Amino acid sequence: MKVLSVFNQKGGVGKTTTTINLGAAFALMMSHEAGANEEPGRVLIIDLDQQTHSEITLSGGFFGQRRQTGLGPYDNIAGLLMMDTALPVTDIIRTSEIPHGARRNMDFIPSSKEKMPNVDTALKNDPIDGLFRLRGILETVEPFYQYVVIDNPPGLSYLSINSLVGSTHVVIPCQLEAPSIEGLTSALKTIQSVQRQHNPRLQFLGILPSMCDFRQQEQNEFLASLHGQYNSLILTPISRRADVSYANSEGLDIFSFKPARRSDQLMSANPATQEFARVAEEIRQRMG
């Protein structure tokens, strides 16, 4: 099982959008690869951000009809991390309605906007295994999933460290703006620290330029600078596009919002689907 942490200590860099669309791309790819009588591999999305935007998208979107999970107030990722739910994780996981065109092979663990703010303190108060709670949850679901994609909170917290400790791979979305690029150093230092102290198997896959607007000369210069410094670690840039925002609001990934004409194809003529498909393929190849 490959566990991909979408990580950056800076907020507003596109972590949630990256998480949803990479997960959808992986699910669609495995659906297309599976034979007619074969079960495709499965993807699990985990939302560790207190804003719970990934979970909102997977549950119907900001403006859509929110789907009810039928679970109690602690039967979610917060309750699992704080050990406040009596249910096993396999009873809490729900199947996402997206991506359309896949064979219902993307799941998510429900989150809780009310409970998530309490999780970091609970983890911090457990000096023995507070950094390893998520790893334990992931070990439980390992037989069922090929990919797990984790949306992380901004800042450096026990939640984000849990994510890195439990992951096999990590990618850093980064806007082509000075504050975001300056924050890369901190993010890379955190990853290296976790690799040394807690998780030597964690592999850094690269930097994902996100929400790019190449009409601005400054952004072209920043991208050239990143290529000069990090070379092959720079992934295909994702442009800022209205369709991506509209898709999030409707509770859809970009591949469902702008689907391909043929059900066995991932990309449509829409540029956003093409960019995310290229990034997903790059990341999948780097994960092996």
Regions found by a protein language model. Name each.
Residues M1-G288:
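P-loop NTP-binding core
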